[in-house]
A protein has these predicted regions:
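A detector of single, family-specific signature residues
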Residues: 1-366
Length: 366
């Protein structure tokens, strides 16, 4: 059933949910189901599940956990701390139900079978400082999006305001508009509509300023963590603290991804053939981790503006008939390879239990 069957005697598939987890112990050689169980998703349940694994899979065992970064994160951290071997599996494709049959334990069996059929299995992402950076990135991203939404709302309020207000604020740059609206005042002689509009503009502008301050504070904290964890990324041309943080969070730790090609595929930067006849083309990859893809795109745009070597490359490829989109795709693939090799050589190791030996990293790293 694949390479995993050669390294383990049992696979314990786990279907994770918010309040409970279902598990199934499956023989790696035959795929036979030895036992199933369901536990609460808490510390007591994790201990029960570990005892279940030791009882029904006493020899070499591996835990194949769905959603190890969300509903299964607590269980994954617990098992790794206990020295267990854990792999991450995507949600398996659900087959057509027979007579309406469906249960969490059946899903756990499918997760185990899915892991046995795959040639490559991912390790769970590291926690610790990487997880700290990840949650700060998510929070900052939420603040930025909320700020953008509030700015759009502010401009819409200006458009519909009465002429005496609209005349004061129209054609004003965004930063100045926010500042002026945050300091608007009313007089008792103003109409009810005027006072209400000013109140709405003032509160919206102050919300924008608060969100901007929040995003700046979070960026400072992210930068401090990046400097402490992967400072080498900041030495690369065109990489700021936010891009470096996203690249590190997506990569996670040494050995998690088997090659620079896998990292590029994760970031949606791997070429997808779209050739026909005498025309050799590659199209954009719109799958993968879009936040990582955004970071790679930002790095490429910065280098196109400030790096003479990148600009010379773009000019040469343009002369060869490549479109700007194709050139950026090529550059993103190069950046992905460069950063992967840098992190594999100098990045942090995972603080997890030992696993069976992996083959060497495949790619163009030297």
């Amino acid at each position: 059933m694949g390479m995993l069957a050669e390294q383990a005697d049992h696979v314990i598939g786990v279907d994770t949910h918010r309040d409970s987890h279902a598990a199934a112990a499956v023989a790696a050689r035959t795929g036979a189901v030895d036992a199933t169980t369901t536990i609460p998703a808490d510390a007591f349940g994790y201990k029960r599940l570990l005892r279940f694994g030791r009882k029904h899979a006493p020899a070499r065992r591996v835990w194949a956990i769905e959603s190890s970064g969300s509903f299964g994160s607590g269980l994954t951290s617990f098992l790794l701390a206990q020295g267990e071997w854990v792999v991450e599996v995507d949600r398996p494709k659900r087959p057509a139900r027979r007579n309406g049959a469906k249960s969490d334990e059946l899903d756990a069996v499918r997760a185990a079978h899915e892991s046995l059929q795959r040639e490559h299995l991912a390790q769970p992402r590291a926690r610790g400082e990487r997880e700290a950076i990840r949650v700060l990135l998510i929070t900052r991203r939420g603040a930025i999006r909320a700020r953008t939404k509030a700015i759009n709302q502010l401009k819409a309020l200006v458009v519909t305001a009465r002429e005496e207000l609209r005349h004061q604020l129209r054609n004003t740059p965004t930063d100045e508009l926010v500042y002026r609206c945050s300091r608007l005042r009313t007089l008792p002689s103003h109409s009810t509509e005027h006072r209400a509009t000013v109140l709405a503009l003032r509160h919206t502008a102050r919300r924008i300023l608060a969100l901007e301050a929040e995003a700046n504070d979070l960026e400072t904290e992210i930068e401090n963590l990046v400097k402490r964890t992967v400072p080498q990324l900041l030495d690369e041309l065109g990489i700021g603290p936010i891009s470096a943080a996203q690249v590190y969070c997506s990569w996670s730790h040494r050995g998690r991804l088997r090659s620079d090609g896998a990292f590029a595929m994760l970031g949606g930067a791997a070429p997808i053939p779209a050739s026909s006849g005498q025309t050799i083309r590659y199209r954009l990859n719109r799958a993968g981790d879009r936040d990582l893809n955004c970071a790679l795109h930002t790095i490429v745009l910065t280098r196109l503006q400030h790096d003479p070597a990148t600009r010379a490359y773009a000019a040469r490829r343009t002369a060869e008939g490549k479109t700007p989109r194709e050139i950026k795709r090529c550059l993103k693939r190069y950046v992905a390879r460069n950063l992967f090799c840098l992190l594999e050589a100098t990045g942090p190791h995972p603080v997890t239990a030992p696993r069976p030996p992996r083959s060497r990293v495949i790619g163009h790293c030297s």
